[in-house]
Every structure is written in structure tokens, then in C-alpha cells.
Amino acid sequence: MGNKIHPIGFRLGITRDWESRWYAGKKQYRHLLLEDQRIRGLLEKELYSAGLARVDIERAADNVAVTVHVAKPGVVIGRGGERIRVLREELAKLTGKNVALNVQEVQNPNLSAPLVAQRVAEQIERRFAVRRAIKQAVQRVMESGAKGAKVIVSGRIGGAEQARTEWAAQGRVPLHTLRANIDYGFALARTTYGVLGVKAYIFLGEVIGGQKPKARPELPKAEERPRRRRPAVRVKKEE
């Protein structure tokens, strides 16, 4: 059996950027990595109703900058900025550092794969028909201007004894093309029969020249280049 590589991890440094941007030594790396996981876990729990699509984390010394990409920024900010102030205090208490929390709105939620997967999972939990939910999701994505979309649901669909997979797709979803800008999202639908997995792939178009060329070492100028002397060749004259 073949397995699909993670479409975002496959394109890191080419068409996608890292969600955690910082450097640490060997001793501190694992602690900061676990800290990032705790930050994301807290935000996913608190901002689920706001439509959380992505969390970016940057570090510099004892300062942490967290940027949340959400569909409903008003839910994060709260009345008079009360909600975001409480979240900032919770993150500072969790990390023990100075935390700057920034909010960025997702312009079109239908073109964000994590939000599409979350919406399908919510519909399944409310006992929507699975085929109808995934077909409507793909149709909304295509109407929003995507080049292609694919939604997959796996598990005990409809309470069946044997797990199966349902999927719907439109357009192109070239997973092996590195210049293809593909967004990927995953969500869980917790039902009375068990947990169903929802995957969403959205093809947003190709990024021409997305890969950054490697910097070539600068050569010294012609005047500065050391000249190599060729060894003199002695030719014997024939007598």
C-alpha cells in the first residue's frame, strides 16, 4: 500500500513557510518544541468557535510573537479587547515569557483547507449525510475560485460495522507538483459510533518561480584573482 506524504511538509521552503520560526540549541530545542505544542493546543481549544486556520510562532530571546489566522477575528478580540487580553495573560502564564498575540483575518474561509475540514466535521457531528456534506464543501470551494478540491471522510460512516472511505473531488489536485500551491487541512468528527477523520485538499494555483535560487559564492574580481604561473617548458634543440 502507498502512503501520501504531507502536502505542506513536502513544500516547506519552496511554496510554504514554516509555522514556527526560531532557532535553539540542542538543550533548549525540545523544551521550546513542546512549548509550541502547548501554545497551539490552548489556542485550538479556546478559539475553535472563531474558525482557527493557522498559528504562527516566532521567538527572540524571552519574547514570543504568536499570530492566529481566524475566520472571525471579532470572537478573538472580544468586547473592548477583553478576550484577547485574557488569552495573552494565559499564554504568558503558560510560557513564562512576554507574549505578543496578533490576530489576522482569513479573507475567504472557503479557500482555507483547515476551515473546510472543520466545517465538514461539524456537519457530520450534527448528523448530516456524509456524501451531501462533502459534495457541498467541494462545490463551495470551487465557486470561491480554487483550481481544484478534494475532501475525504474515513471511518464508521453512518454507524456501519466496517469502516470505509467516502470522497468527492473537482478540478486538479497535483500533489506531486512542488510548485503547486496546495492547502491541506485535517479535522476529527466525534460521533456516537466513533471518530471519523476528515481531510481537505485545495489547489490554489501554481507558484511560478516559488523556489528560491541558492546564493552563489561571489568570485573575486579579475584584478584581485591570483595569477598562477605556468611552469616553464624547456625544449631541447636537436643537434
UniProtKB/Swiss-Prot annotation:
UniProt xrefs under CDD domains: KH-II_30S_S3 (cd02412)
Subunit structure, interactors included: Part of the 30S ribosomal subunit. Forms a tight complex with proteins S10 and S14.
CC per GO annotation: cytosolic small ribosomal subunit
Region of interest called Disordered, as start-end residue ranges on this chain: 212-239
Name the record gives this protein: Small ribosomal subunit protein uS3
One annotated GO biological process: translation
SMART domains xref list: KH
UniProt source species: Thermus thermophilus (strain ATCC 27634 / DSM 579 / HB8)
HAMAP family: Ribosomal_uS3_B (MF_01309_B)
Keyword line: Ribonucleoprotein, Ribosomal protein, RNA-binding, rRNA-binding
InterPro entries in the cross-refs: KH_dom, KH_dom-like_a/b, KH_dom_type_2, KH_sf_prok-type, Ribosomal_S3_C_sf, Ribosomal_uS3_bac-typ, Ribosomal_uS3_C, Ribosomal_uS3_CS
UniProt function note: Binds the lower part of the 30S subunit head. Binds mRNA in the 70S ribosome, positioning it for translation.
